[in-house]
Regions:
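Active-site/acyl-donor-binding loops of N-acyltransferases
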Residues: 101-152, 219, 226-229, 234, ...
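A conserved beta-strand-loop-helix scaffold within acyl/acetyltransferase catalytic domains
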Residues: 1-37, 44-54, 175-252, 256
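Acyltransferase donor/substrate-recognition loop-hinge adjacent to the catalytic core
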Residues: 122-202, 227
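Extracellular structured ligand-interaction cores
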Residues: 29, 60, 141-143
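A general structural signal for short secondary-structure junctions and capping/turn motifs
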Residues: 22-25, 85-87, 135-138, 163-165, ...
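Acyl-donor binding region in acyl/amide transferases
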Residues: 55-136, 256
Length: 256
């Protein structure tokens, strides 16, 4: 499919490994494959995020990384396997597609099938949500992805408002040229801020210290720092962070 971006296999294997993924501090998982005529025709992961369940006062088993051929019996068997596993663990609801945390790809595409996917989002065929509806699943939330075109120059009005806000609240915009330096000085603060800002988001569970350490080590030394902006207040406390990255979708296509 020309619009689908494949997973990075090493990254996916690390995500599934209790030895490599710090989310297993508060998650457990089980993985299932569906076979037909001795061929793999579907896959699914079952996940119990204990921290999220405690936060939202639920007993949910999550399903994620679901893929299947266009056969309702295959999708039914996969979801039944996760549901039964969750039930054996005391869960009473199944929900997904979700990952271990919000840093994993989530949701199911219901429109925009002719748009190039990204490495951080899920692409699926139109029959996927049709199967969900036939199996009695109901949509619980909408996530919308936007494409924004950036002008060559910042409009004067935007710049004036930015300058005014910075002066009024004594804010400072910080840029770095060293990944190790930004990790050492603000790595912990970046993820603590994310925990605070993301707390109200759908299904969110706060990152543990183990996860924070893992993400600092994984991401901050390699991101393009020209696309990372920090904002601090008068006391040098981090109050905002913006992280962007160039699209790797076309490059990812050549890894499959």
């Amino acid at each position: 499919n020309p619009y689908s971006v494949p997973d990075l296999y090493d990254d996916m294997l690390n995500t599934f490994s209790p030895k490599k993924n710090a989310a297993f501090e508060f998650c457990e998982a089980e993985y299932f494959l569906a076979y037909k005529d001795n061929k793999v025709v579907g896959r699914i992961a079952g996940i119990i995020n204990k921290r999220a369940n405690e936060t939202w006062n639920k007993k949910e088993v999550r399903f994620g990384w679901i893929d299947f051929l266009d056969d309702i019996e295959i999708s039914r068997a996969l979801l039944d396997a996760v549901a039964q596993w969750g039930k054996s663990k005391g869960m009473d609801t199944i929900q997904g597609p979700l990952g271990f945390t919000d840093f994993d790809a989530e949701g199911m595409l219901i429109e925009g099938f002719d748009q190039l996917s990204t490495m951080a989002t899920i692409y699926n065929y139109p029959y996927y949500p049709q199967h969900m509806e036939k199996l009695g699943f109901e949509k619980d939330a909408d996530w919308v992805e936007y494409k924004i075109y950036i002008p060559d120059a910042i409009p004067d009005k935007h710049k004036r408002i930015s300058d005014l806000i910075q002066r009024k609240f004594n804010l400072k915009v910080k840029k770095y040229t060293s990944g190790k330096k930004i990790a050492a000085e603000y790595g912990q603060a970046i993820f603590e801020l994310m925990n605070e800002a993301y707390a109200p988001l759908y299904g969110f569970s706060a990152l543990s210290q183990g996860q924070i350490n893992q993400y600092i080590k994984m991401y901050l030394p390699i991101v393009d720092l020209r696309m990372v902006t920090l904002v601090t207040d008068a006391e040098d406390k981090l109050v905002a962070v913006g992280i962007s990255m160039p699209s790797l979708s076309r490059s990812e296509e050549h890894t499959s």
